[in-house]
Amino acid sequence: MPRAKSSVVSRKRHKKILKLAKGYRGAKSKLYRIANQQVMKSLVYAYRDRKARKRDFRKLWITRINAAARMNGISYSRLMNGLKLAGVDINRKMLADMAVNDAQAFGRLVEIAKAKL
């Protein structure tokens, strides 16, 4: 039985990795072994940062809500507690959007929260 050569498979694998490494600087986009290391590391970063993105956005929303709440004379924690007691079920993403784009409606929510405290 003849020896099975892996040239086609290897070339496909190399091309796939080098295609993923496009845009990297220097040897990281030219040499297979170095490109492969960088692509693997990049995929690890991508996985990690997809998880971190959720935390980052939640922090951003809380910061925006807190700033808008303090402009209306109440702290973030008291606002959230007041909204919970009032039965207002609105998430932080929507609250932050409202704080930035519709200050009047956010002010009404603050009044509702203050009334329930």
UniProtKB/Swiss-Prot annotation:
InterPro entries: Ribosomal_bL20, RIBOSOMAL_L20_CS, Ribosomal_protein_bL20_C. The keyword Protein biosynthesis does not apply. It holds the Pfam family Ribosomal_L20. Keywords: Ribonucleoprotein, Ribosomal protein, RNA-binding, rRNA-binding. The keyword rRNA-binding applies. It comes from the Bacteria. GO terms for molecular function: rRNA binding; structural constituent of ribosome. One of its GO terms (cellular component) is ribosome. Transmembrane segments: none annotated. GO terms for biological process: ribosomal large subunit assembly; translation. Belongs to the bacterial ribosomal protein bL20 family. Binds directly to 23S ribosomal RNA and is necessary for the in vitro assembly process of the 50S ribosomal subunit. It is not involved in the protein synthesizing functions of that subunit. HAMAP family: Ribosomal_bL20. This is Large ribosomal subunit protein bL20. It comes from Pelotomaculum thermopropionicum (strain DSM 13744 / JCM 10971 / SI).
